[in-house]
């Protein structure tokens, strides 16, 4: 015999989860549109200038550069975490003002960058970071800073282009990141639910 109370609760929970996903997707699309239309004031308003870097697969990446640095200063490139944007680094940008050239970028599918094809991988983000370096810091010393997914992006770049590390990339800072295997973590949830969380 089927327990109708339990079934009703399960359907209610599924309905709430579905509604939450739909609301989140719509809110993300609206926020991205507003960001692209310039409604938000963020890091660019603090003196940086924007450039677009187009990747080898045609995705346009939004990059902000703060050039207030002495000649020969390193370029510090910040890579944000999952579901964040280049606006994640205001304190760091301020602390480095006048000491280093600061580059902030929105990883694909985040902030004002284009989304690209479905199924984007961390390896792809590493290739994107290589394009950013080539476009906005083709010469000189580079320091890479990555938070969460941004740290994984840096590690993917190191795997993809190890020759950059040492001659060009002089230092790396990895903040609250992982060396991989994130998709295998179930967060203590049943497998189908854990897959939704990723």
Mark where each language-model region is.
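Hydrophobic alpha-helical topogenic segments used for membrane insertion/localization
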Residues: 2-32
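N-terminal cap/lid segment of alpha/beta-hydrolase-fold proteins
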Residues: 39-61
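Conserved HGGG/HGGXW glycine-rich cap/lid loop of the alpha/beta-hydrolase fold
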Residues: 59, 64-112
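Structural signature of beta-strand start/N-cap positions in the alpha/beta core
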Residues: 75, 101, 141-143, 170-171
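Conserved alpha/beta-hydrolase "nucleophile elbow" surrounding the catalytic nucleophile
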Residues: 80-82, 146-151
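Conserved catalytic-core motifs of eukaryotic protein kinase domains, centered on the activation segment
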Residues: 88-90, 113-119, 183-186
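Flexible "cap/lid" loop of the alpha/beta hydrolase fold
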Residues: 155, 159-198
């Amino acid at each position: 015999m089927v327990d109708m109370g339990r079934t009703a609760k399960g359907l209610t929970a599924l309905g709430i989860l579905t509604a939450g996903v739909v609301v989140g997707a719509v809110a993300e699309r609206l926020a991205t549109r507003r960001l692209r239309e310039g409604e938000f004031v963020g890091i660019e308003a603090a003196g940086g200038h924007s450039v677009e870097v187009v990747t080898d697969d045609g995705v346009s990446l939004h990059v902000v550069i703060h050039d207030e640095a002495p000649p020969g200063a390193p370029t510090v490139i910040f890579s944000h975490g999952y579901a964040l944007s280049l606006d994640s680094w205001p304190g760091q940008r301020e602390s480095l003002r006048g000491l280093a050239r600061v580059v902030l970028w929105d990883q694909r599918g985040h902030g004002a960058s284009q989304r690209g094809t479905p199924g984007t991988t961390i390896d792809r983000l590493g290739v994107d970071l290589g394009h950013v370096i080539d476009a906005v810091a083709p010469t000189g010393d580079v320091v890479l800073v990555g938070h969460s997914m941004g740290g994984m992006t840096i590690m993917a770049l190191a795997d993809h282009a190890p020759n950059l590390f040492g001659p060009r990339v002089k230092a790396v800072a990895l903040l609250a990141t992982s060396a991989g295997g994130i998709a295998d973590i179930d967060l203590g949830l049943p497998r189908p639910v854990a897959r939704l969380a990723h």
